[in-house]
Design a protein with these regions (language model features):
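A conserved acidic beta->alpha catalytic loop
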Residues: 34-43, 90
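Catalytic donor-sugar/metal-binding loop of nucleotide-sugar-dependent glycosyltransferases
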Residues: 169-172, 181-197
Length: 201
């Protein structure tokens, strides 16, 4: 299993370095796809470039989904079998990365997803929005197998993820995370869930 860390980035100069360097510290190659961020982000991103950290620049903001699609294609072109998607805002508990990797080693054909465990700092609007999305996911899968469709901390088997992107219409913005997970599920790519805390403070 050859895994690429993919970080879609849009205007997170205060957190992107910590996220990228932490993930590289697990011995993984890291790709940051910058989605048309402000000029102030460029020096931060340029300073991160090394043997194990690459940056691709999208000149115009196209949305999180568009950035992830760009990263998936890069992964294919460079011989990776899996892609570990991580948000750039620093809210994920990155110390759980080995758990996701171990689960993927045991289930290489599954999509391994972070299952957010929220603390008291989670905005109420975010929690209510999650419940609505969870209900929508149940309607589309006729199951409770999609425990959280919005968490951006997940590990895809590359081949089926690219097939979905190329053969179906998947949103280019925040809708991407939920849509690709459901479409993978319809194709028989089942999720494996790893509980992980989410921090907002």
């Amino acid at each position: 299993m050859k895994t690429l860390v993919l970080i879609p980035h849009y205007n997170h100069p205060a957190t992107i370095a910590r996220v990228a360097q932490t993930m590289h510290g697990f011995g993984l190659d890291v790709l940051i796809v910058d989605d048309g961020s402000r000029e102030e982000c460029k020096p931060v991103l340029q300073a991160l470039v090394s043997d194990g950290i690459r940056v691709l620049y999208r000149p115009i903001n196209g949305g999180k989904g568009a950035a992830v699609k760009t990263g998936l294609k890069y992964a294919e072109e460079n011989g990776y079998s899996h892609v570990l998607q991580v948000d750039a805002d620093g809210q994920h508990h990155l110390d759980d990365t080995p758990k996701l990797l171990a689960a993927a080693e045991q289930n290489p054909e599954a999509v391994v997803c972070g299952w957010p465990q929220y603390g008291g700092d989670a905005p109420k609007a975010r929690l209510y929005g999650r419940k609505i999305t969870d209900f929508w996911n149940m309607l589309h899968t006729w199951s409770c197998d999609i425990k959280d469709g919005m968490c951006g901390f997940r590990l895809y088997p590359l081949a089926p993820a690219l097939s979905v992107v190329r053969e179906e219409t998947v949103g280019d913005r925040m809708d991407f995370d939920t849509e690709i997970l459901i479409r993978l599920y319809w194709r028989g790519v089942k999720p494996v869930w790893i509980k992980t805390p989410v921090q907002y403070a």
